[in-house]
From Swiss-Prot:
Signal peptide: none
E.C. number(s) listed in UniProt: 3.6.1.15
Protein name per the record: Nucleoside-triphosphatase THEP1
Species name: Thermotoga sp. (strain RQ2)
GO molecular function, one term: ATP binding
Reactions performed catalytically: a ribonucleoside 5'-triphosphate + H2O = a ribonucleoside 5'-diphosphate + phosphate + H(+)
Keyword flag Nucleotide-binding: yes
Length: 174
């Protein structure tokens, strides 16, 4: 089962992913978290489900890769994020990806491992931007993908809905 969670920025996609990852057995992968200084967002951390942490992007990072005001750290993305996806692919039943977005898509290695994961039999829960990027559209338009749109109205019920779908797909009792 391949589940994509989409929704506007700030609606709670990462919060939902973090809750799911705590509740689901044998999951691997990563999520991203805002970095704030004096109340202002200055970047994003990448955090693996097994506790590794790095910097995905910052406003003051020396990097040739840029998305908006953020300079993207491909080194940490690939050495921490991509590596966590490769480990999860080898060792886990469920792969968590937060997110398949503009910053992450700057990495060829990230795109390759995401394609490999989506082409496999592995279960996936990923957040994905509402985007017209060809790679994103290709993932969203797969026959084996179920897309959930997170919003203020379903924010509290979507967790249980996704858990039910995953459990049903895995043949577990509700």
């Amino acid at each position: 089962m391949k589940i994509l969670i989409t929704g506007r920025p700030g609606v709670g996609k990462t919060t939902l992913i973090k809750k799911l990852s705590r509740l689901l057995q044998n999951a691997g992968g990563f999520y991203t978290e805002e970095m704030r200084e004096d109340g202002k967002r200055i970047g994003f951390k990448i955090i693996t489900l097994d506790g590794e942490e790095g910097i995905l992007a910052r406003t003051d990072l020396p990097s040739p890769y840029r998305v908006g005001k953020y300079y993207v750290n491909l080194k940490d993305l690939e050495e921490i994020g991509v590596r966590s996806l490769e480990r999860a692919f080898q060792e886990k039943d469920l792969i968590i990806i937060d997110e398949i977005g503009k910053m992450e898509l700057l990495s060829r290695k990230f795109r390759e491992v995401v394609e490999k994961i989506f082409d496999s039999e592995k279960d996936v829960v990923a957040t994905i931007k509402k985007s017209s990027d060809p790679f994103v559209e290709k993932i969203k338009n797969r026959n084996d993908v179920v897309i959930f749109e997170l919003n203020e109205k379903n924010r509290n019920s979507l967790l249980n809905e996704i858990l039910s779908v995953l459990k049903f797909n895995r043949g577990e009792k509700q």
